[in-house]
Every structure is written in structure tokens, then in C-alpha cells.
Regions:
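FIC/Doc superfamily catalytic core
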Residues: 1-135, 139-217
Length: 217
């Protein structure tokens, strides 16, 4: 089914008129989580196969008709055409993607747990710079970043909506100047923010004092 066909089907059956791509993406997040659970526990290192599996899980059913039908692109496969992105037009040519990605994986895996956050920042910035797939590079890149952090005993982080501008600026600093510092600093701040927010509302409710039981009715 194409996105258009599924949209029409869902609208007829349940009256849903929102974005079908959003439905796919939400379901795909769960599929990807299920895919990675055991790999995180086993601390499976990054590989071309793992990256393609993550991309397939996250983008199944989300390619638009131009990419899927006209350009012959497929989830889980490297791009067949150029899809430059950003004002600096980053992105490896299709015939260089696999070699560039293999080199990145080798670099990052060699670092291991020595500097997980800096290595994770480099992984993410360089992955987005390579732009290996026709679509979904941002989702895959952020998933791989957190996968890398977790297999190296570092907490995952969330890029919050209100911080997206700073996030894109940090990636742009790498694209323009190969300056990784802004992204490292951004991830440090987001890690603190993620875990601060995750513990909000989890403080125990104060127990009732004796006086509350002894008051006259």
C-alpha cells in the first residue's frame, strides 16, 4: 500500500483524516524499539547491517510516491539518487555512501567507551552529513545516537521540540566548519534536561500527619 492508498482506506474505515505517515511513524517506533532491545543488552556494535535494519524499521510505509515509485527508493536501502540537504548541500554521492558509512562505523567503534558522548556526537553529525538514505536520516541518526550511548553505558537523550533550533544550529556548525563542540555541548545539556524531566512528578507524596487523623469531625 502507498501512503495515499492507506490514507483513503483509514478514512473510510474509521474516519481518520490526519497524517497516515504519522500513524506509520508511531508504529515504526515500536517496531524499532523491539528490534533494538536485545541488541542493546548484548551491546552489539554498530554495523552497516544494523543501520539498514534500523532504517527499514523506522521508514517502512513512509516513503512518498516520488521516492518510492519514480526513484525506486526502498526502506533499508541506501539512496539511489542525490538528496542534498541544508544550505550547505551536504550528503555523500550515492556511490560513496557505503564506504563513507563503513569508515564512520570503524572510527566510532574504535573509540568504544573512552569518550561516549563525543563519539556519539561525531557519529550523529557525520551520519547526517553523509545522509545515506533517501528519507528518514534524522530519525535514524537520533536512534543510532541513543543506541550508541546506551551500549556504552551512557544515558539516552531526547531532543525537545523547543530546542530544535539549537540542535540544527549545532549540526550546521559541523557541516560548515567541522566544529563538533556545539553539538557536544548541546547533547550534554539535553542529557541533563532529559533526566530532570523524567524524574519530575516521581517524588513521593508526603504522608498524612497525625494531626489530620485526630481532628474533630
Amino acid at each position: 500500500l502507498t501512503i495515499k492508498e492507506l490514507t483513503e482506506l483509514v478514512a473510510k474505515v474509521v474516519g481518520y483524516t490526519g497524517s497516515t505517515r504519522t500513524l506509520f511513524e508511531q508504529q515504526n517506533q515500536k517496531v524499532c524499539y523491539d528490534l533494538l532491545q536485545d541488541k542493546i543488552v548484548a551491546k552489539e556494535p554498530l554495523s552497516i547491517e544494523l543501520i539498514c535494519a534500523v532504517h527499514r524499521a523506522l521508514t517502512e510505509g513512509t516513503y512518498d510516491e516520488r521516492r518510492y515509485i519514480v526513484n525506486g527508493e526502498r526502506p533499508g536501502e541506501f539512496k539511489k539518487h542525490d538528496y542534498v540537504t541544508g544550505k550547505n548541500e551536504v550528503g555523500s554521492p550515492p556511490d560513496e555512501v557505503e564506504n563513507d558509512l563503513a569508515e564512520l562505523i570503524e572510527e566510532v567503534n574504535a573509540i568504544g567507551a573512552k569518550a561516549p558522548l563525543k563519539a556519539g556526537a561525531y557519529l550523529h553529525a557525520r551520519f547526517e552529513n553523509i545522509h545515506p538514505f533517501a528519507d528518514g536520516n534524522g530519525r535514524v541518526g537520533r536512534t543510532l545516537l541513543n543506541y550508541w550511548l546506551m551500549i556504552n553505558d551512557y544515558p539516552p537523550t531526547i531532543v525537545y521540540e523547543e530546542d530544535r533550533r539549537a540542535y540544527y544550529d549545532a549540526l550546521q556548525a559541523y557541516d560548515e566548519q567541522e566544529d563538533l563542540t556545539p553539538l557536544v555541548q548541546f547533547l550534554e545539556a539535553q542529557t541533563v534536561k532529559t533526566w530532570s524531566r523524567s524524574t519530575e512528578g516521581k517524588k513521593p507524596t508526603p504522608h498524612k500527619k497525625l494531626n489530620s487523623f485526630c481532628c474533630d469531625a
